[in-house]
């Protein structure tokens, strides 16, 4: 513990020294990060964070017939189907915030909430289409990316072991004012991480990244921060490689999104979330590569493998019949 504190102290001192020696780069990175937050992050994310928590609070515990078969396949507790809407429409980290709020309200057990984190935190369509439509000559590429993103997240929900637990416990939801206050706190945390990582990327771009091939440079930026990674994809000339990189970055979310999620989720372990993101990244890379190289047979094979794994997981975990809410 003492050694870790010592290393943190050295790192903080080194960071302050870098800021003093090259303040212009830090200021440029901070300005770029603030502009990114004002122009893209806040408009595409803040309304979805508020609506995601309100939606999950209003519908949590209520059965949504069209989504119930999907919930059963994903081994979700009965009554939590509304979290899928937040997971696939809200954007990072709206899905994780909705799961965390359900856990904090006592509607979800800790184990169920931690497992849901593995596939309920994804890029939203507002961000995905806003970022990717200008990157590809055909708008169909953006739809393909979204489809692969959703399919890989669903695959994670099937592949990660678990069993359908008891229905959610209905709790009285918080006030709308409390929801908005919480959303503002989450939004401020998200923007702080975006600005910090934009400064880090500015230093790396100035000192190291310009030496690397464009594909590697874009991949490194995407692993650090998703928005900047997507903006840097124009450096990659091959549209096929660009789509594969974009698919992987959207699935992984980047270190910045991970820190946003960790900061927004309290009282839950993140091990299953990390595992889920790695699995989603692998699935997205495989499916996007199959799509751009026209290896369409990979998709049915992928479906068969996931289906077989579903049967195996049911045998391992047992089939529990949930009681209706």
Where does each model-flagged region fall?
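Alpha-helical transmembrane segments of polytopic integral membrane proteins
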Residues: 44-52, 61, 95-99, 125, ...
């Amino acid at each position: 513990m003492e050694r870790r504190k010592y290393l943190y102290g050295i790192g903080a001192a080194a960071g302050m020294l870098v800021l003093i020696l090259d303040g212009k780069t830090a200021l440029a990175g901070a300005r770029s990060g603030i502009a990114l937050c004002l122009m893209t992050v806040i408009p595409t994310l803040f309304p979805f964070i508020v609506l995601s928590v309100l939606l999950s609070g209003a519908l949590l515990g209520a059965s949504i017939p069209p989504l119930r078969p999907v919930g059963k396949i994903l081994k979700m507790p009965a009554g939590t189907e509304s979290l899928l809407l937040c997971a696939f429409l809200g954007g990072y980290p709206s899905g994780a915030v909705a799961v965390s709020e359900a856990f904090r309200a006592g509607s979800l057990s800790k184990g169920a909430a931690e497992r849901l984190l593995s596939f309920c935190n994804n890029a939203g369509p507002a961000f995905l289409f806003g970022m990717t439509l200008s990157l590809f000559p055909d708008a169909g590429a953006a739809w393909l990316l979204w489809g692969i993103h959703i399919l890989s997240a669903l695959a994670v929900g099937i592949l990660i072991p678990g069993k359908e637990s008891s229905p959610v416990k209905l709790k009285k939801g918080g006030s709308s004012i409390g929801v908005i206050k919480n959303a503002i706190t989450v939004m401020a945390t998200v923007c702080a991480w975006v600005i910090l990582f934009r400064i880090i990327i500015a230093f790396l771009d100035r000192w190291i990244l310009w030496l690397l091939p464009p594909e590697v440079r874009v991949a490194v930026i995407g692993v650090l921060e998703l928005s900047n990674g997507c903006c840097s994809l124009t450096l990659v000339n091959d549209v096929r490689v660009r789509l594969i990189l974009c698919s992987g970055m959207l699935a992984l979310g980047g270190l910045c999104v991970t820190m946003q999620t960790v900061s927004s989720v309290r009282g839950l372990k993140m091990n299953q979330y990390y595992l889920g993101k790695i699995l989603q990244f692998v699935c997205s890379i495989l499916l996007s590569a199959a799509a751009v190289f026209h290896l369409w047979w990979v998709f049915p094979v992928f479906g068969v493998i996931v289906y077989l794994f579903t049967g195996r997981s049911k045998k391992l975990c047992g089939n529990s019949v949930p009681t209706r809410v």
